[in-house]
Amino acid sequence: MDSTKLSELKVFIDQCKSDPSLLTTPSLSFFRDYLESLGAKIPTGVHEEDKDTKPRSFVVEESDDDMDETEEVKPKVEEEEEEDEIVESDVELEGDTVEPDNDPPQKMGDSSVEVTDENREAAQEAKGKAMEALSEGNFDEAIEHLTRAITLNPTSAIMYGNRASVYIKLKKPNAAIRDANAALEINPDSAKGYKSRGMARAMLGEWAEAAKDLHLASTIDYDEEISAVLKKVEPNAHKLEEHRRKYDRLRKEREDKKAERDRLRRRAEAQAAYDKAKKEEQSSSSRPSGGGFPGGMPGGFPGGMPGGFPGGMGGMPGGFPGGMGGMGGMPGGFPGGMGGGMPAGMGGGMPGMGGGMPAGMGGGGMPGAGGGMPGGGGMPGGMDFSKILNDPELMTAFSDPEVMAALQDVMKNPANLAKHQANPKVAPVIAKMMGKFAGPQ
């Protein structure tokens, strides 16, 4: 038997040893039957393999790394603990409050009216009557007199302040706040305005705002009534402030934890993406090639030299059928050898190429175009490629993408050689390769 066929048979047997499921291939049923006829025992489960499984290559064994590439890489992130929403507790407060009064707003004075001396005197008389009614406990009557006084003299902050204090006695905090605001618009330093508004806000349970107004009133004109109200208001205001700070802190801590979880998740996702890319890169670099020069030229020389170089005198016309196969190792290698072949040397040779290219390298390439200019004698087909493989300068140049692109361009169209002659990186490589191909002169 031919030594080549024996070598191929040995490779096939080694493949079957490493992966017995190869015997399930329908086209090998005759071989399986032959083995069983000799008494061989086919491993259990081999016959039960799924018939739809794609036959595996006899040349390149599929590796587990290829399968891993299809698996989704999931970052290992700690499960986020779902935290309950923060629910604020009730604050136990002391002091009585009243329901807000929703009566229509009381009559206010017209600040655009010019106040005469007579109006001022009449306003003072109305104020005096209001004080008398107030001392007798006639609050509604006091409100009527003070409203008349405000109408006569709408520029008096005291009139608004007095009416606000009466509304407080009537437990009408909203009306009191309106009068207090009017008094403070006229006189921002009105102690009675701050005092009345602070007491009204305390009645509505607005403890923090009430404390602020009462402190301002006490600063302007301190009295015992303000101090007494503050003693009731301040404890509640402090409790509410502590309560607010507590839950502000809890919310801040919750937001910080969430931000930290998000940061860790993004970091884990980025790490997982990096690990996946690195694994794919390692897998692609370690995956064996189906042929080509060892150490190889990425992507090979695609398609070889289309149509071959024109036939010349001498050499073997049409190239050697079958050509030289790859020598294992270059990713992608010279696919199928250099397709198209380089039959019978270049007619006249390319510039700087002595005597043309060697006879066809490639898997049964197409014969070159007949005829052409007579060459100076074709080169023998059995060129020693070790001269290229053992040349460190050429092998280093092959790893340069720019050089490889130029070589591929020349291989596709030899006429493009001229445009690369001026490239200081490419021209020396092409010249050196021409010298290797030319052989002894």
UniProtKB/Swiss-Prot annotation:
Keyword check for Ribonucleoprotein: no
Annotated Basic and acidic residues bias: 46-55, 244-282
Keyword Iron applies: no
UniProt-listed InterPro entries: Hip_N, STI1/HOP_DP, STI1_HS-bd, TPR-like_helical_dom_sf, TPR_rpt
Single GO molecular function: protein dimerization activity
Phosphoserine: modified positions: S63, S89
Keywords: Coiled coil, Phosphoprotein, Repeat, TPR repeat
Coiled coil start-end: 236-285
Biased segments, Gly residues type: 289-314
Residues covered by the STI1 domain: 391-430
Protein name, as recorded: FAM10 family protein At4g22670
Organism for this UniProt entry: Arabidopsis thaliana
Lineage of origin: Eukaryota, Viridiplantae, Streptophyta, Embryophyta, Tracheophyta
